[in-house]
């Protein structure tokens, strides 16, 4: 039993490392293509064994590992994983809430990323507004913010200040997820800088306010973004309650940028060598 538990732990660690490797590749580059191929070699056999839907013969470990493996497969753009998830969505689109919560977020993300339409976007947004199920709400949030459509990104950002769509307590997650999407990064980063006063009026003085700086630092990872972060936040260093957060989060981005700069070529060369 302990070896099974350690196997799950190993896989969790492995996919967590893989997740961090994404910082080392430029979007739409050969390095990114190589990383996706590498992730596919790590996950393809497991995807085939586990597939999307729970089975009677699943062990506890299978149930824990399935979402990790499928998430990796979708990042790798594994064709069979994508089409199987699309089929599950199509068969359940009138009853998405009844999908197994283990895979629902991934099924929805796959649909938005790879089979998107304005109708799908509006339909999920409407479900988000209406549902009282917090788990389903979160799954929709994760799906919509992974869109590859620039107009939809702008639409999402336009809802940041619409409390009828996005409740204030959910705004930070919407912001962070949009900022973490390569296509959404600029729009979300522009929004927080342009609307800082609005945000301060809305949540300033609240413990949650400084966490907007924390999640911003968690997503930004390039030299140019570091420069912009400093330019925007350094004049706010004397704001009561923000000083420590700004200093710490500047260091977070600085150390990440330095590490990427130092290791990028080694990491990408190593992945390329594994594939050769």
Regions found by a protein language model. Give the residues of each.
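Long, ordered, helix-rich scaffold segments
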Residues: 1-276
């Amino acid at each position: 039993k302990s070896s099974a538990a350690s196997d799950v732990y190993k896989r969790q660690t492995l996919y967590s490392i893989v997740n961090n490797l994404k910082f080392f590749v430029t979007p739409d580059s050969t390095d990114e293509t190589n990383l996706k191929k590498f992730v596919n070699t790590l996950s393809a056999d497991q995807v085939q064994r586990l597939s999307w839907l729970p089975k009677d013969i699943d062990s506890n470990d299978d149930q824990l590992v399935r979402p990790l493996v499928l998430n990796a497969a979708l990042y790798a753009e594994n064709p069979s994983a994508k089409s199987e998830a699309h089929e599950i969505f199509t068969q359940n689109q009138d009853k998405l809430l009844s999908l197994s919560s283990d895979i629902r977020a991934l099924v929805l993300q796959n649909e938005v990323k790879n089979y998107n339409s304005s109708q799908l976007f509006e339909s999920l947004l409407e479900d988000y507004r209406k549902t009282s199920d917090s788990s389903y709400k979160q799954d929709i949030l994760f799906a919509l913010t992974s869109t590859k459509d620039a107009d939809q990104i702008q639409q999402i950002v336009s809802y940041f200040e619409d409390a009828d769509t996005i409740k204030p307590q959910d705004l930070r997650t919407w912001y962070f997820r949009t900022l973490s999407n390569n296509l959404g990064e600029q729009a979300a980063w522009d929004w927080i800088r342009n609307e800082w006063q609005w945000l301060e009026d809305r949540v300033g003085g609240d413990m949650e306010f400084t966490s907007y700086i924390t999640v911003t630092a968690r997503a930004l990872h390039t030299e140019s973004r570091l420069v912009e972060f400093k330019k925007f936040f350094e004049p706010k260093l004397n704001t009561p309650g923000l000083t420590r957060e700004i200093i710490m989060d500047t260091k977070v981005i600085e150390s990440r940028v330095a590490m990427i700069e130092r290791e990028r070529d080694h990491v990408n060369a190593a992945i390329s060598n594994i594939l050769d």
